[in-house]
Amino acid sequence: EMCIRDRAQLTAFTQTLAQCRELPEDFIEDMIMKAPSPDIMNKLARCVLALYSYDEQPDDISIENVLRQSIQLVAQLPTIMSYAYQVKRRHYYHKSMYIHPIRKEHTTAQFILNSIRSDRKFTDEEAKLLDLCLMLHAEHGGGNNSTFSTRVLTSSGTDTYSAIAAGIGSLKGPRHGGANIKVTQMLDCMEQEISDLTDEGQVADFLKRIIHKQAGDHSGLIYGMGHAVYTLSDPRAVLLKEQARKFASGTEFEEKFRSIELVERLTPEIFAREKGNKKRVCANVDLYSGLVYRMLGIPVDLFTPLFAVARMAGWAAHRMEELISGGRIIRPAYKSVSLPGVYTPITQRTEAQPHSSVYVPTEERI
């Protein structure tokens, strides 16, 4: 059983992460600064794959070695993310780039706040809030897209760096890790289109227009509401909402928090009325995480990369579990929905008789 049993072990583990935070010599210059990326998620994946070349035992998939690799990646991913963001600031936004020295006494949350802020200052409350965000995003079962991707690659016997890079690539997708950005964009759109963010009628009308694809990104989706697993409530959202309320109270973010509360309260009844669907709809973690990040001064560029930094621990745990108990390669079955077709040699094909199989409509499938 691998677990941290007391504060002494926690301190030792925190110190281990701090000692592993540094990247290999010249890695920052060669892998991060020389090839700026418009999306930091791609830079994370590229750098993780590059770290394979710096490992003396990259293909050793013994649990001991994978644990070593995983701890190093848990420690180094925040470093890569922070430096990649600074390089993006300089290259794409033409702003100053800050590369601060790593302080070994910092926790992961403290390191991130220290490295992305020009003055390096943060409060204990800010670090605790970011730490909570990282913990809430660290693990969410093996069925989510990025973790399943990691397990699929692990089952093939590939190396740790390839498996984790696949997870990062999956998480980049707007239907997965990019969902909190979609929430932020939706709320920004609402702020532009209505005059009072705390007016229940105006917010309700905006949500109704979203459902009918007349507002937002015209997808018909109210981002931050609903979950594939949770129906009554998302416990992560409950915790973040409580903390967001405390941090927003008496600040410029209080009105935004109240508007998000309205979205959470009004969406189920509007959804039921407009769609005739009685399914329970609850807020998910993405509804409040974007506001929390903004209150911490974290730029949108880092919303999804922060998710990856947090989920690295979960990916590592699932990879080791798959190595220990999997045994077989994961190969989902796919059933063809077309009728058999006769192969026609290319020299005998005509426009009137192309080589093609016949598609079977969903309602006619057996």
Q: Residue spans of the language-model regions?
A:
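Non-transmembrane, aqueous-exposed alpha-helical and coiled segments at domain scale
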Residues: 5-366
